[in-house]
């Protein structure tokens, strides 16, 4: 049974600007070290950062909490499986709230086009 859905769209140019400004504190606050390593190694790193940010926003919308109840940006991490499929790993408070809600699955889809990054999350009981 579907518990919640979340969609977010982000302008990739925002993250290009953050990268040009050398805004390391922002990246360190939002992304895990693994996400920073992954995105920084990519040719279009701003696109990858924007996608991961949109994924985290989408999860928070699907869960229905936003950044309340002690959830941190780093409690969510986007990883790719062996075939490149994106998955959302949950830690600490995000994982705790996920379990408390009786959820069993988190489906994530990412896409980008025309300067925008889009993420959709479906949470299932």
Swiss-Prot record:
Annotated InterPro entries: 4-PPantetheinyl_Trfase_dom (IPR008278), 4-PPantetheinyl_Trfase_dom_sf (IPR037143), ACPS (IPR002582), Ppantetheine-prot_Trfase_dom (IPR004568)
Gene Ontology biological process terms, A to Z: fatty acid biosynthetic process
GO terms, molecular function: holo-[acyl-carrier-protein] synthase activity; magnesium ion binding
Binding site for Mg(2+): 8, 57
Annotated EC: 2.7.8.7
Pfam families on file: ACPS
Catalytic activity reported: apo-[ACP] + CoA = holo-[ACP] + adenosine 3',5'-bisphosphate + H(+)
Lineage top rank: taxon: Bacteria
GO CC annotation: cytoplasm
Cofactors (names): Mg(2+)
EC category: transferase
Transmembrane regions listed in the UniProt entry: none
Key words of the record: Cytoplasm, Fatty acid biosynthesis, Fatty acid metabolism, Lipid biosynthesis, Lipid metabolism, Magnesium, Metal-binding, Transferase
Localization per Swiss-Prot or TrEMBL: Cytoplasm
Role summary: Transfers the 4'-phosphopantetheine moiety from coenzyme A to a Ser of acyl-carrier-protein.
Family of the protein in this entry: Belongs to the P-Pant transferase superfamily. AcpS family.
Name this polypeptide is given: Holo-[acyl-carrier-protein] synthase
Species per Swiss-Prot/TrEMBL record: Citrifermentans bemidjiense (strain ATCC BAA-1014 / DSM 16622 / JCM 12645 / Bem) (Geobacter bemidjiensis)
């Amino acid at each position: 049974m579907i518990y919640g859905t979340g969609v977010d769209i982000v302008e990739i140019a925002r993250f290009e600007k953050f990268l040009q400004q050398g805004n390391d504190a922002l990246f360190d606050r939002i992304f895990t070290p693994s996400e920073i390593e992954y995105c920084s190694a990519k040719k279009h790193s701003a696109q990858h950062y924007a996608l991961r940010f949109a994924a985290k926003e989408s999860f928070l919308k699907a869960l229905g909490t936003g950044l309340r109840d002690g959830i941190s940006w780093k409690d969510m991490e986007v990883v790719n499986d062996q075939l490149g499929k994106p998955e959302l790993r949950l830690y600490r408070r995000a994982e705790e709230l996920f379990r408390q809600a009786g959820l069993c699955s988190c489906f994530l889809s990412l896409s980008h086009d025309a300067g925008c990054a889009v993420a959709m999350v479906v949470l299932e009981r």
